[in-house]
Amino acid sequence: MSEKIYMAYNKIQDYLNSYFAKHKIEASMFDAIHYLYNQRDFSYKSTELNWPEEKCSNLDDLYQVLKNIAIEVTPIIRNSTANRLIKNVSEHSFFNKRQDANILLQFQHDKNQLHKHDYFEINLVLKGMLIATLNEEKRMLKKGDFLIISPNTIHQINVGSDSIVVCITIRKSTFDKAFFSLIQNDDPISNFFKYN
C-alpha cells in the first residue's frame, strides 16, 4: 500500500454518531476509520478545502466547509489495528512534508484515549463544550474558550454532543519560528512555550 488514503470527516463522524445511537457507547475514531476502510469508503485523492466565494459569515457556513475536509488516514491504516490505539503520535506521521499546520474538527462521540504528540494543538470551542484531561486534571471549556496543548502533554479531548470544536495542529518548528520573538522574553507565557 504505497498510495495515501483519505476519508471525509463527515463519513467518520456519521459512523461515530450511528454507533453511539445504536449501542449507547462511544466507538473510537480508529474503529470508524477501519470500518470505512473495510467497506472501501475512502479515496486515494485528497480534496482541497473548498472555501465558498463569499466569506463564511456564520458558524453554520464554517462548519459546512470544515466537515467536508478529507483526512489522510494512511498512518492509522498502516500502523494500527482497530484494537490498538496510538498513544504517541509523531508529527512525521500526522503532517505531510509540505504542511506546517492542519485545521480540522474534533469528533463528537469519539472514544478518545489519553495520548500525546510532538506538535502543538489548539482547540477552539465554537459551539457547545469539551472536556479536556491534561496530565490527569479535567477542565471543561465552553463556547469561546480555547486551549493550547504543548508538545508531549498527555491529554484527552471529549467533545459534547452537537458541539463544534475546531482543532488547529501546528508543527513545533513552525510554532517556534512564528513565535520566536515572543519566546525570547522572560515571563510566564514565554517560559511555557520555551519549556513545554
What annotation goes with each model-predicted range?
Residues 1, 91-92, 130, 157:
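Helical anchoring/docking segments at protein termini
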Residues 1-33:
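N-terminal leader/propeptide segments of preproteins
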Residues 5-6, 56-94, 98, 160-196:
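A hydrophobic/aromatic-rich effector-binding and dimerization subdomain
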Residues 8, 12, 44, 85-88, ...:
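Short linear sequence motifs
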Residues 18, 92-93, 107:
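Generic detector of bulky aromatic hydrophobic side chains
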Residues 26-80:
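A structured, charge-rich N-terminal accessory region that forms the first stable segment of a protein
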Residues 98-189:
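N-terminal regulatory/effector-sensing and dimerization cores
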